[in-house]
C-alpha cells in the first residue's frame, strides 16, 4: 500500500482516484456512519472541497483507494472553525502558519484485511504516517481536526494521542471532539507501519501491472 499526494494542480491527472475517494466518503460517512452529508451521484462532497485542499490517498497494489484524508491550511477556511466552532473551547482556533486541518479521514475496511499488532488497519496507520510526513514536508508543525470519541481512542492506541481543544459535544448521531496532533519525526516513527512508502506522483500503469 502506498500514499499518493494529490495537490490542486494534480486534480485532473488523478481524477479517477479522486472519484473513488468521493465514493468512499459517501459509503463511510453517509452509509456506515449515517452522518448528515450531501451525496450526489454516489459521491460525497462539501464546501471545503472547493478551497483547493491537498488529498492524501492510500492506494492498494491493485490501484484501489483504501483510505483518504483532506488537508487545508488552518489560516484559511476550515471545517473546524466555520462548521464546528462549538467544539473549540474559545470558539476559534488561534490558527497560525504552522497549523493544518485534517478532515474527511476514512478507510475502506472491506479492502484491508491485514492488521498490525495493535489491531489497527494497515490503511489507517499508513494514512497517519502520510499525514505527518506531508505536514512536516509542507512546513506544518501541528494538525487540528474534528473527530469522534471512537477515533480519539484509535489515535491513542496508535501512540499518537490527541490534545483536546474543547469538551466532547453531541453533533447529530455522534459525540464529537476537536483536538490537535503533533507533526514531528517522533510521531511519524511511532505510527509508521512496516513497509511504508509514499510518492508525490504515481504511475497508474505501474500500479496495475503490479497487481
Swiss-Prot record:
PROSITE patterns, sorted: AUTOINDUCER_SYNTH_1 (PS00949), AUTOINDUCER_SYNTH_2 (PS51187)
Reactions catalysed: a fatty acyl-[ACP] + S-adenosyl-L-methionine = an N-acyl-L-homoserine lactone + S-methyl-5'-thioadenosine + holo-[ACP] + H(+)
Enzyme type, top EC level: transferase
Single Gene Ontology BP annotation: signal transduction
Highest taxon listed in the record's lineage: Bacteria
Gene Ontology molecular function: N-acyl homoserine lactone synthase activity
EC number per UniProt: 2.3.1.184
Keywords from the UniProt entry: Autoinducer synthesis, Conjugation, Plasmid, Quorum sensing, S-adenosyl-L-methionine, Transferase
Record flagged with keyword Nucleus: no
Keyword flag Transferase: yes
Pfam families: Autoind_synth
Cystine pairings recorded for this chain: none
UniProt cross-references to PANTHER family, sorted A to Z: ACYL-HOMOSERINE-LACTONE SYNTHASE, ISOVALERYL-HOMOSERINE LACTONE SYNTHASE
Summary of the function given for this chain in its UniProt record: Required for the synthesis of OHHL (N-(3-oxohexanoyl)-L-homoserine lactone), an autoinducer molecule which binds to TraR and thus acts in the control of conjugal transfer.
Similarity comment text for this entry: Belongs to the autoinducer synthase family.
Protein name as catalogued: Acyl-homoserine-lactone synthase
Source species of the chain: Agrobacterium fabrum (strain C58 / ATCC 33970) (Agrobacterium tumefaciens (strain C58))
Lineage, top ranks: Bacteria, Pseudomonadati, Pseudomonadota, Alphaproteobacteria, Hyphomicrobiales
Name of encoding gene: traI
Amino acid at each position: 500500500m502506498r500514499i499518493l499526494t494529490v495537490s490542486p494542480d494534480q486534480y485532473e491527472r488523478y481524477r479517477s482516484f479522486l472519484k473513488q475517494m468521493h465514493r468512499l466518503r459517501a459509503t463511510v460517512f453517509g452509509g456506515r456512519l449515517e452522518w448528515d452529508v450531501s451525496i450526489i451521484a454516489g459521491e460525497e462532497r462539501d464546501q471545503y472541497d472547493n478551497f483547493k485542499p491537498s488529498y492524501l490517498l492510500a492506494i492498494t497494489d491493485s490501484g484501489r483507494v483504501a483510505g483518504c484524508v483532506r488537508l487545508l491550511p488552518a489560516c484559511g477556511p476550515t471545517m473546524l472553525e466555520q462548521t464546528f466552532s462549538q467544539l473549540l473551547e474559545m470558539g476559534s482556533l488561534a490558527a497560525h502558519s504552522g497549523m493544518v486541518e485534517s478532515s474527511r479521514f476514512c478507510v475502506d475496511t472491506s479492502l484491508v484485511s491485514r492488521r498490525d499488532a495493535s489491531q489497527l488497519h494497515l490503511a489507517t496507520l499508513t494514512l497517519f504516517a502520510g499525514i505527518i510526513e506531508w505536514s512536516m514536508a509542507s512546513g506544518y508543525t501541528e494538525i487540528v481536526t474534528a473527530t469522534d470519541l471512537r477515533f480519539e481512542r484509535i489515535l491513542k492506541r496508535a501512540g499518537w494521542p490527541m490534545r483536546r481543544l474543547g469538551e466532547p459535544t453531541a453533533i447529530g448521531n455522534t459525540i464529537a471532539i476537536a483536538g490537535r496532533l503533533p507533526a514531528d519525526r517522533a510521531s511519524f516513527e511511532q505510527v509508521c507501519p512496516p513497509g511504508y512508502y509514499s510518492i508525490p506522483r504515481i504511475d497508474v500503469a505501474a500500479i496495475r501491472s503490479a497487481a
